[in-house]
Amino acid sequence: MFPNSILGRPPFTPTHQQHNNFFALSPTLYSHQQLIDAQFNFQNVDLSRAVSLQPLTYGTVSPIQTSTSPLFRGRKRISDEKAFRLDGKRQRFHSPHQEPTIINQLVPLSGDRRYSMPPLFHTHYVPEIVRCVPPLREIPLLEPREITLPEAKDKLSQQILELFETCQQQASDLKKKELCRAQLQREIQLLFPQSRLFLVGSSLNGFGARSSDGDLCLVVKEEPCFFQVNQKTEARHILTLVHKHFCTRLSGYIERPQLIRAKVPIVKFRDKVSCVEFDLNVNNTVGIRNTFLLRTYAYLENRVRPLVLVIKKWASHHEINDASRGTLSSYSLVLMVLHYLQTLPEPILPSLQKIYPESFSTSVQLHLVHHAPCNVPPYLSKNESSLGDLLLGFLKYYATEFDWNTQMISVREAKAIPRPDDMEWRNKYICVEEPFDGTNTARAVHEKQKFDMIKDQFLKSWQRLKNKRDLNSVLPLRAATLKR
């Protein structure tokens, strides 16, 4: 991607290097994304209605690779795959409203490892400690189990499934983003040697579409000695340097770089090779944590991903899915869907943070958060509602049942809870709790006109869909497919 900038010929002169002691510490965070080989082999969904998550492999490498070997000239490192015997035990998983439901939790036995959840990243780590961070070693990854999509027994459910299968992010889309991330990490490490660049958001959380942008988090201070970067001063300074080099040194590969001085400043840019738009922030590490929390929810129940993707498409079509214009962010929309599925009389989703607090605690170090999806078995709900019924129920819930004035959406608690009386919440029209840091993810909705527009769209869409039971009545499928 950047052929003249990595292998023996850095694009930045020594005068442009950072010599501040603040960034001169040797890196200790061994990112799960170091030179990931994005080996995805998605199955044909037309025949089997199944999506297979493919193995990725990673290992320890030096922050800046200067080898001239062909191995580091953009070619993939391929691990031998081994076949493992499937073995498991049965375990009880309690539904809050009914008798315990029996599910199969596949537990590793006799050295064999296989999970019923599709692990995106999975590795053993060497027990020896290097500055408090266990280094990773490259190993073969297991073939993940196929995730079958739900059956569609009515027209509306069939439309939802077909739109999902057409618009969901493909293996090639993720591979493009990962290759760009890996190359940019090497470039940025020439400025900040201890930094790591993480791909976060919808690209990894299971809710991405083919048209989804890429979100990147640059971590320049690492755990266990991690502390927050001041977003108004340090983050802006770091991003100013990154933006400058994007403009001057990488202009042949990156176009339209913009430094956005928001509450959480970002650099927006477009990669000319992959044609993907990216947003890059600094040390917004909660985004790394919630990426893997949402990924676990995405694959916990097979109706979640199709429902979320169609609702995001619906919101975008009606122009209520743009935080920069005072409406809902995609993240807030996803949390709203998860919350609805948690609050049904027979829930389709539980609260993962309550059931697995050790896996989704903020005390879990960043280099370990990717283990969480591997440790959670599927949740088998007794709720047999179709995708069409769930979409209708979602619209009805927020149109007629949820109390916007007094309640806050909480996925962490798996219920609507009273709004806090703090200033941060008092004057906001919509309150959606961020599961890790407790902030309001819907704070962008600060105008009554936009709030009324959002509520009105929920009500009108619910009424139309209830009468016609045709997705085209609220989301023209042809237009949605073209914007996939």
Curated annotation (Swiss-Prot):
CDD domains: NT_PAP_TUTase. The keyword Cytoplasm applies. The keyword Endoplasmic reticulum does not apply. InterPro entries: MTPAP-like_central, NT_sf, PAP_assoc. Gene3D superfamilies: 1.10.1410.10, Beta Polymerase, domain 2 (3.30.460.10). Mg(2+) binds at D213, D215. Keywords: ATP-binding, Cytoplasm, Magnesium, Manganese, Metal-binding, mRNA processing, Nucleotide-binding, Nucleus, Phosphoprotein, Transferase. It catalyses: RNA(n) + ATP = RNA(n)-3'-adenine ribonucleotide + diphosphate. It is found in: Cytoplasm; Nucleus. One of its GO terms (cellular component) is perforant pathway to dendrate granule cell synapse. This is Poly(A) RNA polymerase GLD2. It comes from Rattus norvegicus (Rat). The gene is Tent2.
